[in-house]
């Protein structure tokens, strides 16, 4: 089976799940899958995907896994006690051929947020690995190793980049579990202190790597339905995060409503309270310049703040960003697909996004065209109006 541990997922799933347990235990949600890569036929693999998901739903946390989570400073004992009883339930997920045809499949996850939040990452990893093990039966690992060595060589070649560190954010779109582990071992050996950590909790535990992550888009999206007022939903989400973590895990995600709306809400209080922010769509150079200026305008020294970049990075882009911003702020880089699925084959652009919470539509208004997903065009238009965003919905909206 592909997934053999419930820790084989991103850390931010657990940090968000703890907030859900303590503050939103009754919330119900709906997620949907989308493959953005045109011409991909996933229908022949539905039975394999279902079998892997069935196996996923049989997993439980082991005592050693629970002990590991308990040792993380921000994980609370009652959350670990809850996880000791937890398992994913197959009744909350359906996988069917899409009525649209064209080889598309529908994956719908629907149920209590607390009991569905851990589906996304392993299900995406399953879809990816099932697809590639059927379409690339003899993977060119030699090519993959060569490309990985070149990346390590490039990052380590110049002394002025000695403090430039990267982290692995590639679980969801990895070529395979076996390849993911080899990549991590190679990065550990080849980069040394320039390898900052991984978002994958299982490999963080088994390879003694620093686990990394705070919040994802789904958390701030859900707050559209959970907060007192839609216009205040981003502020509400950040305040509830601070209430749970009291200054820990202080990286705010900036692109749920776009950078303009984020900067309006990210006032002096949040500038001082949060350690930094994460970029995940739009022009990263423009984003960094605007955020640094925003900190200065709010009487915060940007050199004390962390700018995290995680949108479709490769090593040359990391180095360009580092060269632009080094010395002006603290920097962190999360590299995903370019590390864990670069063997010479076209990676699948697959996502699972929250589309409803408590029966109400929720949406992300990304800084990048094509990244938004919403099944309700009227709500998307209303959301843009509320947050003062003038650009029209992108092609993914309402699909």
Swiss-Prot record:
Q: Which InterPro entries match?
A: N/Namide_PRibTrfase, NAPRTase_N, Nic_PRibTrfase, Nic_PRibTrfase-Fam, Nicotinate_pribotase-like_C
Which example biological process does GO assign this protein?
A: NAD biosynthetic process via the salvage pathway
Phosphohistidine sites (modified residues):
217
Give GO MF terms, alphabetically.
Answer: nicotinate phosphoribosyltransferase activity
Annotated protein name in UniProt? Nicotinate phosphoribosyltransferase
Its post-translational modification remark reads: Transiently phosphorylated on a His residue during the reaction cycle. Phosphorylation strongly increases the affinity for substrates and increases the rate of nicotinate D-ribonucleotide production. Dephosphorylation regenerates the low-affinity form of the enzyme, leading to product release.
Biological pathway: Cofactor biosynthesis; NAD(+) biosynthesis; nicotinate D-ribonucleotide from nicotinate: step 1/1
